[in-house]
C-alpha cells in the first residue's frame, strides 16, 4: 500500500516537535486588533502546543508521516 500524502494545508499550519507534540500558531490575530490592549496583542505572539487529543488527530489524519 502506498504512503499517505501529507495535507499541504496542515504542513503550513502545524509543526511536530521532537517529543511528538504538535505546535500551532496562536489564533485571534487576523482582525479586530484595535479593540484589544497592547498586552493582549503581545500575548498572542508565538506558537502554542495543541491538546494531546487534538494533536493525535492532526498527526493521524493530516500529518501521517510525521
From Swiss-Prot:
SUPFAM superfamilies: L35p-like. GO terms for molecular function: structural constituent of ribosome. Residues 1-40 are annotated as: Disordered. One of its GO terms (cellular component) is cytosolic large ribosomal subunit. The keyword Translocase does not apply. PROSITE patterns: RIBOSOMAL_L35. Keywords: Ribonucleoprotein, Ribosomal protein. Belongs to the bacterial ribosomal protein bL35 family. This is Large ribosomal subunit protein bL35. It comes from Bradyrhizobium sp. (strain ORS 278).
Amino acid at each position: 500500500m502506498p504512503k499517505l500524502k501529507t495535507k499541504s494545508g496542515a504542513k503550513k499550519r502545524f509543526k511536530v516537535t521532537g517529543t511528538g507534540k504538535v505546535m500551532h500558531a496562536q489564533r485571534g490575530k487576523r482582525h479586530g486588533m484595535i479593540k484589544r490592549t497592547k498586552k493582549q496583542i503581545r500575548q498572542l505572539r508565538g506558537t502554542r502546543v495543541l491538546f494531546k487529543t487534538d494533536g493525535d488527530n492532526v498527526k493521524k489524519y493530516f500529518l501521517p508521516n510525521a
